[in-house]
Amino acid sequence: WLHGMPKHYVSRPPKASDGCVVLANQDLLALKKFVDIGSTQVVISERLDFVPIDVWQSHRKAALRMVDTWKKDLEKGFSKGIYHYASDVKIDGQGLIEWQKNQQISNKSFGKISIDDLTVMRYPSDKDMMLVSFKQEDKLSGEIRKQQYWMKVGTRWQIVQEDTSKL
């Protein structure tokens, strides 16, 4: 999370943010003018490597094709969509089998899946990892926001973590 500090704090002890990025309230208010709260991605890295536009476009196109294939397979049924998930995937904090059992979706259909507000980010420190974030709507889940972490395993990209929140 990116957030400000309680009003009565002048500063915060180092490393007391529980993994969050903490800004002075004045700085957070200034930043608010330039970002869309709740949807602007924040990348933290020791170093950023910029790539030529054609390389970026090629990576983005490949990622969009991957997500589209995942979506189309999931529309055909969970047994088709499961192909895109790593065997040790965590979905909303659960392993695949546990999640599938709790959701009772193995024989249910998602129907038509709509995806909007899609963003794709390669991890700065790991070229074989990317974060895909989007809004999803289908008859089984309703309207949700999804974050998928895709990792390249050998020659194949797989979802290694998926987090969902209601909109």
Segments (PLM) and residue ranges:
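Exported/periplasmic cell-wall-interacting domains
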Residues: 1-68
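A mature extracytoplasmic/lumenal domain signature
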Residues: 4-6, 27, 35, 46-48, ...
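Stable alpha-helical elements in mature extracytoplasmic
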Residues: 27-31, 66, 70, 82, ...
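A structural boundary/capping signal
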Residues: 52, 74, 115-118
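Short, well-ordered alpha-helical segments enriched in acidic and aromatic residues
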Residues: 76-92
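Surface-exposed, charged secondary-structure patches
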Residues: 101-149, 163
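Short, solvent-exposed coil/turn segments at beta-strand boundaries
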Residues: 126-127, 152-158
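Low-complexity, intrinsically disordered terminal/linker segments enriched in charged
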Residues: 153, 161-167
